[in-house]
Amino acid sequence: MAPPAKRARRGLVPPGYKYLGPGKSLDQGEPTNPSDAAAKEHDEAYAAYLRSGKNPYLYFSPADQRFIDQTKDAKDWGGKIGHYFFRAKKAIAPVLTDTPDHPSTSRPTKPTKRSKPPPHIFINLAKKKKAGAGQVKRDNLAPMSDGAVQPDGGQPAVRNERATGSGNGSGGGGGGGSGGVGISTGTFNNQTEFKFLENGWVEITANSSRLVHLNMPESEKDRRVVVNNMDKTAVNGNMALDDIHAQIVTPWSLVDANAWGVWFNPGDWQLIVNTMSELHLVSFEQEIFNVVLKTVSESATQPPTKVYNNDLTASLMVALDSNNTMPFTPAAMRSETLGFYPWKPTIPTPWRYYFQWDRTLIPSHTGTSGTPTNIYHGTDPDDVQFYTIENSVPVHLLRTGDEFATGTFFFDCKPCRLTHTWQTNRALGLPPFLNSLPQSEGATNFGDIGVPQDKKRGVTQMGNTNYITEATIMRPAEVGYSAPYYSFEASTQGPFKTPIAAGRGGAQTDENQAADGNPRYAFGRQHGKKTTTTGETPERFTYIAHQDTGRYPEGDWIQNINFNLPVTNDNVLLPIDPIGGKTGINYTNIFNTYGPLTALNNVPPVYPNGQIWDKEFDTDLKPRLHVNAPFVCQNNCPGQLFVKLAPNLTNEYDPDASANMSRIVTYSDFWWKGKLVFKAKLRASHTWNPIQQMSINVDNQFNYVPSNIGGMKIVYEKSQLAPRKLY
């Protein structure tokens, strides 16, 4: 008789939690909430202390401080009690300064340490001290993971310790922490760490770092800009060229890391799609550090020369919209996220958002008589919404050497599969019984399969006939759906192409690829285009999804309710039959079978240009899927991060002048880094045969390595190569 299964020791853990309390083991499964997750991390750190010979129970450790930071905004009672317990311990217990070893991963990492300042700093400090200057204190920087938990998109966790005294050169106000001039405040890390857990789970920590360049805005004003290209849409047949809209252009810039290429290199993605079966999006955090602010002046000599000087008093404005009060503007749909190459400086995109503008455009074709109805309405006063960051979001001022951390945001999203389905409706359920089987190698059963079609048993929904065939037998549901494609609907703000979920169809013709809804991406040198290619024409690719949605437009037909065999031309509608008096238009262009019986997978991750997460609509009836991103945040999504150079004014500033204010030309370079955590399930093999995996041929290999002048590109990679059955 097998021994009884060994149960994990639960200890003194209150109901509703798995790790918040003493005396339990570390194999309790997934934490129940952010406070429980913080407790699990705290317990793992304590275990590391004990393995290294230190007793964390008698001292206040960095792990205790990390737990305090992560639970300071806790809304559950257990998190609040734990938070105040360790605050009390902090007040009475001696400090344990040494940090525990990090848990091992497939790529070992070292704890983040402050780099030592250069020797001339100490020489300067000694001179200033001798002259009577105050003693400069060095602030102790915690690693980025010490930021506050942000389960509801709360306020950013910024380090407010600032160095004081004249030796640092960056004293004064500001919302971020300060490392001081000449002292590094962070690390450059673009490693992807794979931590293999129990029961086939893998924790994937994607680290990303970029040098970000930011120029001062052209204007300090918000502008309402209306785009009007009625000259093009006034021509018959040009409805799809309509670009009329209104937008608010702001002086702010958006730091957007919401694209797969920001986080994973091609080798990482190959490993993930070849070995994992599904992805869970766990948490996200980001930080700005090592801020550099410089002014530009131009000499009066001929030819003029530019002089660049560090400005220790200029400010970088940083705002985190943690409560999602501003319009959500993911930049991946415009290919304007942070760049995909870690060693190349990148720029944040100018932030703008849509403003309401009514528009009427009546469809026409080249043979239409008369001028198209092409009305340029304007903004409805009832729908005016003008947002400003300055009075909606806390703004932090950073100077040279300062830093800013957002804290950790925990996602609430459904998982994303990394497998595709091959089954359509014709491959669901039990196949028909065969009376005879082939007797020779390679032989095929031709003709009748053993039982006359009108004598078979089973279930159909066909009236007026007793025939049961593979075409007429009733299946449990509809795999995929027929969607209108090349279909434009009219809204009060103009026509728009209706989105459809991507899926592989039948024959690979241009017509059918469009019908399958496969997205087509256009991008520049920051996002995968060959870096040495000249010209402004973007590079493009069409992502053909592996999953099968059951669409095959050129083979669809509709049969009359009075089912007749054979059918005549008056009781069947074929793809070649005219619709509305026009020929060559499939009924699939206008027919939608998406309904309560439809079975459909989520959209695939599109590496590297695809969007990762999206915001849930604030509507009562919500879409079940979004076509831009596989992860849809159920409650809140990470706050958008905005940056802007504060106005660096001259003595000629006149508040009554109508022209742009007089400013010193200023720009900033700062380092951005982030951490995006996933959990993935290892893919188990259930078939005898091996399967196709992500690989490359000899010619494609050289896309991923630099040429003799440094040219390289990123080729898109499939994400759902492994097949699976869905029924």
Curated annotation (Swiss-Prot):
Residues 1-40, 95-120, 141-184, 503-535 are annotated as: Disordered. Its main location: virion. Residues 19-64 are annotated as: Phospholipase A2-like. It comes from Canine parvovirus type 2 (strain Dog/United States/780929/-) (CPV-2). GO terms for molecular function: metal ion binding; structural molecule activity. It holds the Pfam family Parvo_coat. GO terms for cellular component: host cell; host cell nucleus; T=1 icosahedral viral capsid. Keywords: Capsid protein, Clathrin-mediated endocytosis of virus by host, Cytoplasmic inwards viral transport, Disulfide bond, Host nucleus, Host-virus interaction, Magnesium, Metal-binding, Microtubular inwards viral transport, T=1 icosahedral capsid protein, Viral attachment to host cell, Viral penetration into host cytoplasm, Viral penetration into host nucleus, Viral penetration via permeabilization of host membrane, Virion, Virus endocytosis by host, Virus entry into host cell. The lineage of its organism: Viruses, Monodnaviria, Shotokuvirae, Cossaviricota, Quintoviricetes. This is Capsid protein VP1. SUPFAM superfamilies: ssDNA viruses.
